């Protein structure tokens, strides 16, 4: 098994940190400090070395320390391709983010070729009651760990969709280019939908196989393209292309693309109660979310032979003793780098003896 982990992390003008340097090993790491000390900021900085805008989905302008024009995050990281230096930096004045791998610029969506990461934050506990966009992004992040190329597909799809919207809204007479764009969107959509379905199959098996103290979930996806594939429809790409063509007039008025894999919803049910997670209590929702994360970790390691970095923000809060103890034993047995934030060590003191403590 190959472990992805940080050897060091350097922050410059990042959030509340003027300068911060951490040295770490392939072990559990506990960040302990009062609320507002910057624990979650450190997790967010690490999450920037994975496709997307980090675990907060923050705007670039909010990441730099107040009154500073630039900020920098640098990591010496054991990646899928070996030991490497990664940097990501922002400038308010240009509103640009630049990411580098061993001093060579790379696209944000390429990060999944080098790293693998899973995170759980208090904000995510509302994912079942929020909009479908949050759940869809959550599912796609899971897919990244099984298929690193998926991030690039999602990025390309969003680019072509944006181009299509511009052509329609600006009323350009460019049917040939529009046709090419829609054909590209259709082809990419087919790959995205199949990747999601394949990953859901893996994940459902992982959930059913893993005996633990958390409720099991049934996973599915509610999307026209995915359902057509499940129903065995042939010529999916042609079907999507035709739908995009037929919705041009409608989409021109709306100013957006009304059909496609960007409209799909990730559905989660409490398996035993047979009800959608959004109708469960907040405690049950958190427990279901943890169960999904544990299954993802377990199966990603089993299937890809790669252990991702795990970021857990205040995960032990409001867990009963039985579930807290199970989670500690599960995490300790993973033999990988995980980062945990907490305001105190109450209830996790035994776990702390096996971890690197960083006090803020």
Swiss-Prot record:
Transmembrane segments: none
Highest taxon in the source lineage: Bacteria
Keyword terms: ATP-binding, Cytoplasm, DNA damage, DNA repair, DNA replication, DNA-binding, Nucleotide-binding, SOS response
One CC-aspect GO term: cytoplasm
Entry's localization field: Cytoplasm
GO terms (BP aspect): DNA replication; DNA synthesis involved in DNA repair; double-strand break repair; SOS response
Gene3D superfamilies: P-loop containing nucleotide triphosphate hydrolases, RecF/RecN/SMC, N-terminal domain
Molecular function per GO: ATP binding; single-stranded DNA binding
Residues that, per the record, bind ATP: 33-40
The protein's role, per its UniProt record: The RecF protein is involved in DNA metabolism; it is required for DNA replication and normal SOS inducibility. RecF binds preferentially to single-stranded, linear DNA. It also seems to bind ATP.
Family to which this protein belongs: Belongs to the RecF family.
Protein name (database record): DNA replication and repair protein RecF
